[in-house]
Amino acid sequence: MSKIPTRIVRESSDSELPITVRIGKSGVIDSVIDEIKDQLSSRSLVKIKLNRGVASGSSERMEIFSTLATKTSSVVSFSRGNIVVLWSGK
């Protein structure tokens, strides 16, 4: 996929964009992946929050974010701390 449009980056970093998926202590399971795919089919941006304790450090968080993007055929358009926004590319 090519470069992410500026408009998408701006929308992704907006704090008003609501968190629509939370990943808890069970981690990235199939039902979470399916929910993200469903949301990406109806909207272009999905904001996800990892609850405390899911990832121990920033490298583990980035690995989880990368895995989510790969499994949902999307792109990480924004990440900060335990928050990631995935873009469907549409």
Model regions: which residues?
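Positively charged, polar, low-complexity stretches
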Residues: 1-90
